[in-house]
Amino acid sequence: MANYYEVLGVQSSASPEDIKKAYRKLALRWHPDKNPDNKEEAEKKFKQVSEAYEVLSDSKKRSVYDRAGCDRWRAGGGANVPHSSPFGAGYPFRNPEDIFREFFGGLDPFSFEFWDTPFSGRGRPHGLHRVFPSGFGEFPAFMEALSSFNTLGHGGGSRSTFSSASFGGSGSSGFKSVMSSTEMVNGRKVTTKRIIENGQERVEVEEDGQLRSVTVNGKEKLMRVDK
């Protein structure tokens, strides 16, 4: 069986934050949805990464793993697993997709246009992955990845887009992303801001500097009209 530290590409002395960063990077790289032409290998790698993260991110499981030795860990280990270990043959690991969703706060990171979508004819922005090819796993936990772009929209109108993403130190609960897009529509300056934080999506639309609509998780909020 593979050494879980080697699977995540970290040292046996890696900190919990190192484990999170490694999982974030590899899970995004090997998620089956990102590898449609190599799905079988991707599923295998994704499962390995998930199992490694499940064990090494839990201090108790990691301690048992370190004491038992990676070569005697679970998956048919039977008698090779120490009697004191709660993990025997056929240990029920969690569904890799459940771990992935939980890590990203219930959000689908591949749905964000700025994640790694290049410019298209509609003026969508380069993704953060394009700016930082190594992926989020290389980021310090407190660091923001910023990208700002300008392009021409249809009909010669201008459009600018700004996006940012940041991760706190607690994995999913520390995730926040902001995407702001401004374009001219019929002579009016329309700015749309999309904020995703702690599993909640908020979309604000401004027209010539005045807030026109607010939508939270797909439901439009009533706006107060000042007389």
UniProtKB/Swiss-Prot annotation:
Annotated coiled-coil segments of the chain: none
GO terms, biological process: chaperone-mediated protein folding; negative regulation of inclusion body assembly
Functional description taken from the UniProt entry: Efficient suppressor of aggregation and toxicity of disease-associated polyglutamine proteins.
Comment field on protein domains: The antiaggregation activity resides in the serine-rich region and the C-terminus.
UniProt subunit comment: Interacts with histone deacetylases HDAC4, HDAC6, and SIRT2, HDAC activity is required for antiaggregation.
PANTHER family: DNAJ HEAT SHOCK PROTEIN FAMILY (HSP40) MEMBER B8 (PTHR45168:SF2), DNAJ HOMOLOG SUBFAMILY B MEMBER 2 (PTHR45168)
Stated name of the protein: DnaJ homolog subfamily B member 8
Originating organism: Mus musculus
Gene that produces this protein: Dnajb8
